[in-house]
């Protein structure tokens, strides 16, 4: 199983490539929060934010494997799950194990962070189910994209909360407004990246 999972990550979730980007993403969000409140983030806050965010993005990959399994089997049979390299059940077990680690890290920093953690998981769960209206969403690509990209501000909220929540900063006045603008920007940036990622040349369409 270990060898198969290693082969899977190389194709669908390259640890080094994704890890560097996620580390920069998580650390910058935590540091921004500290900058806005006029302090410095703790090393523990940065470490927890980066590791938990890494877990989020892996779980999003697993969620996508489940959500897109029917289409992948039909149109992209060369991918790891359709061709039988790993099973959805095996990926679920790994994702649950990652979730246990996320809870442990979160509680080690501040138990109140369980709120933002559960919020991300809740959105991820309904997103995997296409908000229970898959046919309706697929006919409305803009709404589809925005509903899925809405998870990005929630992930950013968790990352910033790793700093401001243990520091006892309330979300009000200038701090809250600036943080809100940052979260909105993360939604816009995520949407732009998603549009670029899903834009295919005509000869690559299936």
Q: What would you call each of these model-derived segments?
A:
Residues 1-206:
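Multi-pass alpha-helical membrane architecture of UbiA-family
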């Amino acid at each position: 199983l270990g060898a198969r999972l290693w082969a899977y990550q190389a194709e669908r979730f390259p640890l080094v490539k994704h890890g560097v980007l996620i580390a920069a993403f998580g650390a910058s969000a935590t540091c921004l929060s500290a900058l806005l409140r006029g302090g410095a983030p703790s090393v523990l806050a940065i470490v927890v934010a980066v590791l938990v965010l890494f877990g989020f993005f892996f779980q999003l990959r697993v969620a996508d494997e489940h959500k897109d399994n029917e289409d992948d089997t039909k149109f992209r049979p060369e991918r790891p799950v359709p061709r039988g390299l790993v099973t959805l059940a095996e990926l679920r077990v790994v994702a649950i194990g990652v979730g246990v680690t996320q809870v442990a890290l979160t509680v080690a920093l501040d138990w109140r962070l369980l709120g933002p953690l559960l919020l991300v998981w809740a959105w991820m769960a309904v997103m995997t189910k296409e908000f229970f209206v898959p046919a309706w969403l697929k006919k409305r690509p803009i709404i589809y994209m925005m509903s899925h990209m809405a998870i990005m501000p929630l992930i950013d909220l968790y990352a910033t909360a790793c700093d401001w929540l243990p520091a006892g900063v309330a979300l009000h006045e200038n701090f809250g407004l600036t943080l809100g603008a940052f979260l909105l920007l993360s939604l816009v940036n995520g949407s732009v990246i998603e549009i670029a990622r899903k834009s295919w040349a005509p000869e690559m369409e299936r």
